């Protein structure tokens, strides 16, 4: 029997309180808020420290433990198909909404008056991104380099190859697989220790955001922000909600189940901060480890629904604000470019904003200097992007697992019905098969 823990001990309550305190500190004591930035940065760095080994262990254990290698290719193929369809829908929705609402209309901004120097670094980084460059970048120069740099796609590629190789060894490779499983348990224990610091990280990150940019900076471009937030909400409830209903579960129950991860993302504005816990929770929802290990990390580059909505809305908003005419041909061109450029969003520093700069440079018709318009509020829009991305990847994992018949639907329904109440760190580790005491000797 699971005992419900007091609310003040729950992570989501602590993070909520931390976010509120951070907002108040940043608003009333902005200098103090800015000074707390290292708290948020430090927490995210702690999470990033263990992401690479956790992805490696999860993917290798999942692939090496599978009966047939054909199922790996099948899972990857279905995942990419899902990513392409849903992210395209997200791009289209952003394009439609920004054309209907027209948040930038009437601003009549003269491009010549904008300070292009503020966005020069983003434009330079954006120009460095190309399709061929992105594909080649997936291949690490060295194995150590992939882990040292924490590049998710590079680590994922090596992990898949390692998993295949380990599977081919059969019984001879079992000691290696056993070691990797035990190492994974150590990593997840480290994550549980780090997550105790989540409220502190959320407080520091939120205090810095409000202290550095101020609530007042939201007013000038508030219409775009409101439009974007509402669009993301509707996308989650209508599009993702419809996908969930078609596959026999509720997106509302799923959101409730991952509420702690969502609050961590809200506080830190980094969806990466929730990646390790998402691997645990998706597996506990009934998806096989092999599916979770492939879909979640890959989704961080190829299934960024919130970023897709942001990219089309921001690009057309700049055109509207600067009175740059965009006919249907220009908008179709923009959409086609974004279908490619958006897939590398998580692989570059600065994520969506740099991809937006790369897109404007590639399209050519839109003024790149217009990026200065949204530079000030981009930080405030990153929360909605990250939250939508996280929910989108959670839905994708369950759907793909069901498509490839690697989902325990009874477990899914029972876990969602529980709402994640009473989940403790001990239970998380127990679900991974770790017992108290010394590890048994492998003979």
Swiss-Prot record:
Subcellular location as annotated: Cell inner membrane
PROSITE patterns in alphabetical order: NA_DICARBOXYL_SYMP_1, NA_DICARBOXYL_SYMP_2
Pfam families xrefs: SDF
Gene Ontology molecular functions: fumarate transmembrane transporter activity; malate:proton symporter activity; succinate transmembrane transporter activity
Membrane topology: Multi-pass membrane protein
Record's keyword terms, sorted: Cell inner membrane, Cell membrane, Membrane, Symport, Transmembrane, Transmembrane helix, Transport
Broad class of the protein's primary localization: membrane
Gene Ontology BP, a term: L-aspartate transmembrane transport
Function: Responsible for the transport of dicarboxylates such as succinate, fumarate, and malate from the periplasm across the membrane.
PANTHER family (UniProt xref): AEROBIC C4-DICARBOXYLATE TRANSPORT PROTEIN, PROTON/GLUTAMATE-ASPARTATE SYMPORTER
Family as reported in the entry's similarity comment: Belongs to the dicarboxylate/amino acid:cation symporter (DAACS) (TC 2.A.23) family.
Name of the protein in question: C4-dicarboxylate transport protein
Phylogenetic classification of the source organism: Bacteria, Pseudomonadati, Pseudomonadota, Gammaproteobacteria, Pseudomonadales
């Amino acid at each position: 029997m699971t005992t419900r823990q007091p609310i003040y001990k729950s992570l989501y309550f602590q993070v909520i309180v931390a976010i509120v305190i951070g907002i108040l500190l940043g608003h009333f004591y902005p200098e103090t808020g800015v000074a707390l930035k290292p708290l948020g940065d430090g927490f995210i760095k702690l999470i990033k420290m263990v992401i690479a080994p956790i992805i490696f262990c999860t993917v290798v254990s999942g692939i090496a433990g599978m009966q047939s290698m054909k199922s790996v290719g099948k899972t990857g193929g279905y995942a990419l198909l899902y990513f392409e369809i849903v992210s395209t829908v997200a791009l289209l929705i952003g394009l439609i909404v920004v054309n209907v609402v027209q948040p930038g209309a009437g601003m009549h901004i003269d491009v010549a008056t904008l300070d292009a120097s503020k966005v020069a670094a983003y434009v330079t980084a954006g120009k460095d991104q190309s399709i061929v460059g992105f594909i080649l970048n997936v291949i690490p120069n060295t194995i150590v380099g992939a882990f040292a740099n924490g590049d998710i796609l590079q680590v994922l590629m090596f992990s898949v190859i390692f998993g295949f190789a380990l599977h081919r060894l059969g019984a001879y490779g079992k000691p290696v697989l056993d070691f990797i499983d035990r190492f994974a348990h150590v990593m997840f224990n480290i994550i549980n220790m780090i997550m105790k610091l989540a409220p502190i990280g959320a407080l520091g990150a939120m205090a810095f955001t409000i202290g550095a940019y101020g609530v007042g900076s939201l007013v000038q471009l508030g219409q775009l922000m409101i439009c974007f937030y509402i669009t993301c909400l509707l996308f989650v409830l209508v599009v993702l909600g419809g996908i969930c209903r078609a596959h026999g579960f509720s997106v509302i129950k799923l959101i409730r189940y991952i509420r702690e991860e969502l609050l961590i993302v809200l506080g830190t504005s980094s969806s990466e901060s929730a990646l390790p816990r998402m691997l645990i929770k998706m597996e506990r929802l009934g998806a096989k480890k092999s599916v979770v290990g492939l879909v979640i990390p890959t989704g961080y580059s190829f299934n960024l629904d919130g970023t897709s909505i942001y990219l089309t809305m921001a690009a057309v908003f700049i055109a509207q604000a600067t009175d740059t005419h965009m006919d249907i041909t220009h908008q179709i061109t923009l959409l086609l470019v974004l279908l490619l450029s958006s897939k590398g969003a998580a692989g570059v520093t600065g994520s969506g904003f740099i991809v937006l700069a790369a897109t404007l440079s590639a399209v050519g018709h839109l003024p790149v200097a217009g990026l200065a318009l949204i530079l000030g509020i981009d930080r405030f829009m990153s929360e909605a992007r990250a939250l939508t991305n996280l929910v989108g990847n959670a839905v994708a994992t369950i759907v793909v697992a069901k498509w490839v018949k690697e989902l325990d639907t009874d477990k899914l329904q029972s876990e969602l019905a529980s709402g994640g109440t009473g989940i403790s760190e001990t239970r998380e580790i127990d679900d991974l098969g770790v017992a108290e005491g010394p590890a048994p000797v492998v003979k």
